[in-house]
Amino acid sequence: MSTQQQSYTIWSPQDTVKDVAESLGLENINDDVLKALAMDVEYRILEIIEQAVKFKRHSKRDVLTTDDVSKALRVLNVEPLYGYYDGSEVNKAVSFSKVNTSGGQSVYYLDEEEVDFDRLINEPLPQVPRLPTFTTHWLAVEGVQPAIIQNPNLNDIRVSQPPFIRGAIVTALNDNSLQTPVTSTTASASVTDTGASQHLSNVKPGQNTEVKPLVKHVLSKELQIYFNKVISTLTAKSQADEAAQHMKQAALTSLRTDSGLHQLVPYFIQFIAEQITQNLSDLQLLTTILEMIYSLLSNTSIFLDPYIHSLMPSILTLLLAKKLGGSPKDDSPQEIHEFLERTNALRDFAASLLDYVLKKFPQAYKSLKPRVTRTLLKTFLDINRVFGTYYGCLKGVSVLEGESIRFFLGNLNNWARLVFNESGITLDNIEEHLNDDSNPTRTKFTKEETQILVDTVISALLVLKKDLPDLYEGKGEKVTDEDKEKLLERCGVTIGFHILKRDDAKELISAIFFGE
């Protein structure tokens, strides 16, 4: 059996190799050498065509172009052939012409357009292309295209459109050129007239005009059902049974983990604001709303930066509200104590959310923390506030850092003197003053409320201990008379008395006056 390889192509690769060799001045080459070279050439050509067909297939085309062959050569680390025109790029069919040579062979060549050298030479040179660069910009933020130089100008787009199709763009531009379909009183006019006759400027007095409604934010049916289901579950009045609690936790978990809630975020924010302002007496519902806020803040798939300024009023309202949860059921000490615990727990939750927001979004809103500090300071300096407002304000102060707390520390003496009515009070009679419930001028707060406020102030001052150096050696030392005098001048008698009773009084006093 013969093992000689045979070519099955319609052209003769051996003759082609022989012609190329003769053009290079190589004659009398052995036929075996020509066959070996021809088979290698044929393999290389098939390899190039195979790669070119891959590019054609990935480009979703049916016609193999010279550009595919050039890319195949580059993949095979071969310099591509230059000067071959790809007619497919200009939607022009590639055509070949046939010429019969003297030897009886047919030669095909590509029909190309003849170019006049005079016209080609006298044409101006094309502009030098710019170097390719890459940059990033926001194509859209929450579905709204930002007005930056990289994005097309909406006003230019509007002007380029005929007047009768500008309606969808007018709302986005907040323009006064409202598009109105005109119904004329004459029989010749109709709503299918030219665009110029439909513009508002061409509406004559006496004509009936109808203003199109503004473009609404359209939600899918699935999102509407989801929103209504979540809202009804979270606002259900009877949540004592196990099934209702299970549904509530499932809704909160969904808000915390689902990644397709971007379109519903503004609706949830509006719902939160409405529920807080309308239900300040319902502690259970307010607690659920705070859990809802925490779930949205914990969802890593939602971009909440544009909505933080809308969430902060809701959090601060529950933190500083004058009255939460209505009133106690009766005047018994036990009921009043439990009512204070419930309302204070809600304010503690709001303070923890405030701390979470300030730590999670420090770069998005650099003015967020100063604005919160100013709000708390303004509330702190108002001596006509009630216990709940002061408690929430002090809990909010305790989540701030040391430098912010020192702003309040400078006004603490005046605040304590006015709020706790410390006129004529010293360390010698402070304990008797605090225990004298029969004195109506003792303070405007009850003994329990006063103790809670003092403990909250001290918990905020304990944050200042972080400013002390690691090698602080004052732990366990006794407080001197000079330290007591400075403490009372800075914090007032009531707060200073409770600080001096602590085991870490010396360390806390050093933290209060650290750096002075």
Curated annotation (Swiss-Prot):
Protein keywords: Cytoplasm, Nucleus, Transcription, Transcription regulation
GO biological process, one term: positive regulation of DNA-templated transcription initiation
Pfam families for this protein: TAF, TAF6_C
Main location: nucleus
One GO CC annotation: nucleus
InterPro entries xrefs: ARM-type_fold, Histone-fold, TAF6, TAF6_C, TAF6_C_sf, TAF_TATA-bd_Histone-like_dom
GO molecular function: chromatin binding; identical protein binding; molecular adaptor activity; protein heterodimerization activity; RNA polymerase II general transcription initiation factor activity; RNA polymerase II-specific DNA-binding transcription factor binding; transcription coactivator activity
Subcellular location as annotated: Nucleus; Cytoplasm
Domain Histone-fold: 6-75
Family: Belongs to the TAF6 family.
Domain notes per entry: The histone-fold domain (HFD) is required for interaction with TAF9.
Additional remarks: Present with 6506 (+/-1290) molecules/cell in log phase SD medium.
Function: Functions as a component of both the DNA-binding general transcription initiation factor complex TFIID and the transcription coactivator SAGA complex. Binding of TFIID to a promoter (with or without TATA element) is the initial step in pre-initiation complex (PIC) formation.
Subunit structure: Component of the 1.8 MDa SAGA (Spt-Ada-Gcn5 acetyltransferase) complex, which is composed of 19 subunits TRA1, SPT7, TAF5, NGG1/ADA3, SGF73, SPT20/ADA5, SPT8, TAF12, TAF6, HFI1/ADA1, UBP8, GCN5, ADA2, SPT3, SGF29, TAF10, TAF9, SGF11 and SUS1.
Record's protein name: SAGA complex/transcription factor TFIID complex subunit TAF6
Gene source species: Saccharomyces cerevisiae (strain ATCC 204508 / S288c) (Baker's yeast)
Name of the gene encoding the protein in the UniProt record: TAF6
